Amino acid sequence: MFEISRTLNAALLSNEGSTETQWRQADLPQLQGWAEKGLLTQPKMIISNMEPQVTNGPNSATANGPSSNSRSCPSPMQTGGSNDDSKTNLIVNYLPQNMTQEEFRSLFGSIGEIESCKLVRDKITGQSLGYGFVNYIDPKDAEKAINTLNGLRLQTKTIKVSYARPSSASIRDANLYVSGLPKTMTQKELEQLFSQYGRIITSRILVDQVTGPTGGSRGVGFIRFDKRIEAEEAIKGLNGQKPSGAAEPITVKFANNPSQKTSQALLSQLYQSPNRRYPGPLHHQAQRFRLDNLLNMAYGVKRFSPITIDSMTSLVGMNIPGHTGTGWCIFVYNLSPDSDESVLWQLFGPFGAVNNVKVIRDFNTNKCKGFGFVTMTNYDEAAMAIASLNGYRLGDRVLQVSFKTNKTHKS
């Protein structure tokens, strides 16, 4: 399904001296053919991404992709590698779930000789986690791969290709959540506001429409810096300030970064309270929202503490809502009868790696029964998706989004 023409790729790479017009004339028909077969979409955008670019070097790192705390074998760069490795080792995010190891190798092998290539899979199920690593022999081939394949559209996914960075405490947890932004602020203006504090890896402004970037801003955005210290300076400088065009001060804080002490206290309080009640997915919306916020903080300790979730829950004899063998399962309620899996992909894809989606259908009509499930690889990304999409208006319906629990609707 994902077979890429080596002949075409070779032609693309040999045309570095060609003009933009010659490039488009030579390659657009083939790309359009791929689009007609469903292999690619937006061929003009792909060609644009295939044209030579100037990269930011090893620090143009990944963001919003699966973090190194996934249940998978880390790459050499994640466990600490040499400076030479940093120029040949790439991480590739947002791969289609049904892409195979062979297709992954074929795609990146068309650029140059590969030393190693790994599509990361769940150790239990063998299912792709939607990302992988490629290590080239020649640093120039790694740079070409970024220039050529970053932004390539495969099925419903736009893959992200960038240098893998060595694991270091200085670069972890540098993602910021920003709210109260002017509805007219663009992504470029958001970056301009924060760029004075350090190198920005990625940025995003949430919009109301799930079908594309044409919707109105929700006044909420995310900024990921290269280093945590830069993010800390941005919080000090901008939290509570009024940027140009803002009617009220903005809030700038780390995206889901609780302390271990607070997390353990909240977890104990939630699970050991004799008066604890679990509101259902359809009632007591405000109460459930507060409970979800506490749960989000409590379970976040998995990433930020060596204490595992299983060891914490053993203290109180409870299971973690939403946690499965393949990731974090999210319950989505109040979908319209015409909703299908593509709606869930579009909703949750921007927040991180999605393992799978499922819309529950009526056996007789094959229409959506009003709810579905999304499994995401990374806890932080799942929690951020819930925080952003719970209460989101989709058409004439307001979605209710939470981690799946034992009391959630069964299919």
From Swiss-Prot:
Q: What does this protein do?
A: RNA-binding protein that is involved in the post-transcriptional regulation of mRNAs. Plays a role in the regulation of mRNA stability, alternative splicing and translation. Binds to AU-rich element (ARE) sequences in the 3' untranslated region (3'UTR) of target mRNAs. Mainly plays a role in neuron-specific RNA processing. Required for the maturation of motor neuron axonal branches and dendrites.
Q: In which tissues is it expressed?
A: Expressed in motor neurons.
- Please give the family membership noted in the entry: Belongs to the RRM elav family.
| GO biological process assignments | axonogenesis; mRNA processing; RNA splicing
Cellular component terms (Gene Ontology): axon; cytoplasm; dendrite; growth cone; perikaryon; protein-containing complex; ribonucleoprotein complex
Record Pfam families: RRM_1
Q: What happens when the gene is disrupted?
A: Reduced overall movement, decreased initiation of swim and turn movements and decreased mean body curvature change per swim half-cycle and mean number of swim half-cycles per swim. At 2 and 4 dpf, decreased axonal branches and at 4 dpf, decreased dendrites in motor neurons. Defects on motor neuron extensions persist at 26 dph. Decreased GAP43 mRNA levels.
The keyword 4Fe-4S belongs to this UniProt entry's keyword annotation: no
Q: What is this protein called?
A: ELAV-like protein 4
Location in the cell: Cytoplasm; Perikaryon; Cell projection, Axon; Cell projection, Dendrite
- Keyword DNA repair tagged: no
Q: Where is this region: Disordered?
A: 50-89
RRM domain location: 88-166, 174-257, 328-406
- What is a GO molecular function of this protein? RNA binding
- The scientific name of the source species is Danio rerio
Q: Which UniProt keywords apply?
A: Cell projection, Cytoplasm, mRNA processing, mRNA splicing, Repeat, RNA-binding
Q: What InterPro entries does the annotation carry? A: ELAD_HU_SF, HuD_RRM3, Hud_Sxl_RNA, Nucleotide-bd_a/b_plait_sf, RBD_domain_sf, RRM_dom
Q: How does it assemble?
A: Interacts with smn1.
